Amino acid sequence: MVQQAVVGSGITNERVIAAMAATPRHEFVPANLRNKAYLDMSLPIGDQQTISAPFIVSFMTEALDPQSTDKVLEIGTGSGYQAAVLSPLVQQVFTIEIVESLGNRARATLKRLKYDNVLARVGDGFKGWPRHAPFDKIIVTCSPERVPQPLVDQLREGGLMVIPVGERYQQTMYVLRKKNGKMQAEALRPTLFVPMTGNAEDNRQVKPDPLKPALFNGDFELTKEDYPFV
């Protein structure tokens, strides 16, 4: 998987490559999909959410430029896989999941696999985690329509945020750098992530399209008919 999906796709950061190779992705997917765990594809993990494809995880991780002294906030724990990849690369990971069942499951998995520098909780990621701010880096694995101001406020001066931003069905991955209190944006690539819910969804101007009910989680290839348990 690593040679094809990560190195073969242009990832060059040796620490990121090593972390991807060392992280057991099969531990973060449903048992009935473990035979697909090392394919470069997103997979459903329940509750209308997905685990991102390995290339996307490695791409976002490399864009984050993780350093061993970094305190990182992740928004959208999901299965816990992204937090697990970050764990050996940074000092500490704080991760928030809004879906209670997913958050509890991810926390149990991370604890069982002894990712001891990862602290997970259930909550609305739009609001960040003020108690542990400021953060050196923030990585967002769900898509808001606009960058949440609480996350900007909780990023330290000189810090970096990787985030997909846009409408529900069309987004762009950005890396944002905080300079003099303002965010400088660099567009990285088009992308498609599950939408950020909670406060972000309540304030979304472009609402779900009732004519496309199968497009329920931001992934065009997944429908409830394909995966009835999601």
Where are these regions (language model features)?
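Conserved nucleotide-cofactor-binding alpha/beta core module
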Residues: 65-174
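Extracytoplasmic/secreted proteins and extracellular or luminal domains
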Residues: 131, 169, 181, 212-213
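Short, solvent-exposed loop/turn elements at domain surfaces
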Residues: 28-30, 196-197, 224-230
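Conserved class I S-adenosyl-L-methionine
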Residues: 165-192
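Extracellular beta-propeller repeat domains
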Residues: 163-165, 169, 195, 200-205
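Class I SAM-dependent transferase core
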Residues: 1-73, 77, 85, 89, ...
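Extracellular and organelle-lumenal recognition/adhesion modules and their flexible linkers in secreted
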Residues: 205-230
